[in-house]
Amino acid sequence: MSVIKMTDLDLAGKRVFIRADLNVPVKDGKVASDARIRATIPTLKLALEKGAKVMVTSHLGRPTEGEFKPEDSLQPVVDYLNNAELGVPVRLVQNYLDGVDVQAGEIVVLENVRVNKGEKKNDPELGKKYAALCDVFVMDAFGTAHRAQASTYGVAEYAPVACAGPLLAAELDALGKALKEPQRPMLAIVGGSKVSTKLTVLDSLSKIADQLIVGGGIANTFIAAEGHNVGKSLYEEDLIPEAKRLAAATNIPVPVDVRVGTEFSESAPATEKSVTEVRADESIFDIGDKSAEELAKIIKSAKTILWNGPVGVFEFPNFRKGTEVVSNAIAEATANGAFSIAGGGDTLAAIDLFGIKDKISYISTGGGAFLEFVEGKVLPAVEILEKRANG
């Protein structure tokens, strides 16, 4: 990836506009989960250390363009940053499109970009206004890199210099390492409820990976493709031919035993049984012990592991075991020298639940962007940085 990196630039005295991903959940005016802010703090500190005049912005939620409401404000993020021991004051500026007075030794947070008219459709006039605020534009929001918007693409077209921030650069390096030059054998684990939403991902990975593992509702479609009864399980009958095609093209292990329940609830009892014995009134909510052990063996022999999605309904304690065994096997493989990368909301929730955050090589912050990169799609915000880097 030939992009200019923020780490390589002299920023002393320069006005630096950082597009971060500070789209965090807010409850009662306070930040409810700070992971994305914590991930951005090193970028802010780096800009301050380099003597820059620092502006940072983000989207938050889904406001109506042109209509500011208090609940759309980045004020809770500003409050959080003021308590984050950055050593400088942090202030919010609401009206900034005609210019911002920013000094070295402070951080100015520019209000929610999605309130600005033309943001989502990448209005060039808005892109030019953002660009006029800065000497250097830093794209550091991998989670929105798959969207060409005024604050992710337009500004990068018109800013005097456009570069990748440390977070974005790390994402691109980690994904490149997993997908473009993987150590073999390479394993991809794809979970989720539907084959249809992950079909292009499965197709792309089947060409790169030595081994594919499918989990969740996706696995149910593969079980049905083998001719087994899946009862009331979530599966896609119309995609059975696709499942057969993928299974024939790639080595995909299908569960030999499963955990079933008769209702989708936290208190539903789990019954473990052979995959050949699922009754019409039962649903598959997890893999069984034999299948989990089989997957653990495959995982521990891999040298590169890409993980997107759980293998069962891990939110319910009775159907958690499969995902827990898989999670621990990935952690063990990583400890033994494998490179592991994980992405997607459910995957991150599983990582938190099983306490393996520090045992995965790289955890991606992007959901949609992560999947689009895996599919081999060009991410617009990265494409424009490459264009700018190469004149």
Swiss-Prot record:
Its main location: cytoplasm. It comes from the Bacteria. Pathway: Carbohydrate degradation; glycolysis; pyruvate from D-glyceraldehyde 3-phosphate: step 2/5. Pfam families: PGK (PF00162). InterPro entries: Phosphoglycerate_kinase, Phosphoglycerate_kinase_CS, Phosphoglycerate_kinase_N, Phosphoglycerate_kinase_sf. It is found in: Cytoplasm. It is an enzyme of class 2 (transferase). It catalyses: (2R)-3-phosphoglycerate + ATP = (2R)-3-phospho-glyceroyl phosphate + ADP. Transmembrane segments: none annotated. Substrate binds at residues 21-23, 36, 59-62, 114, 147. Belongs to the phosphoglycerate kinase family. PANTHER family: PHOSPHOGLYCERATE KINASE, PHOSPHOGLYCERATE KINASE 1, CHLOROPLASTIC-RELATED. This is Phosphoglycerate kinase. It comes from Actinobacillus succinogenes (strain ATCC 55618 / DSM 22257 / CCUG 43843 / 130Z). The lineage of its organism: Bacteria, Pseudomonadati, Pseudomonadota, Gammaproteobacteria, Pasteurellales.
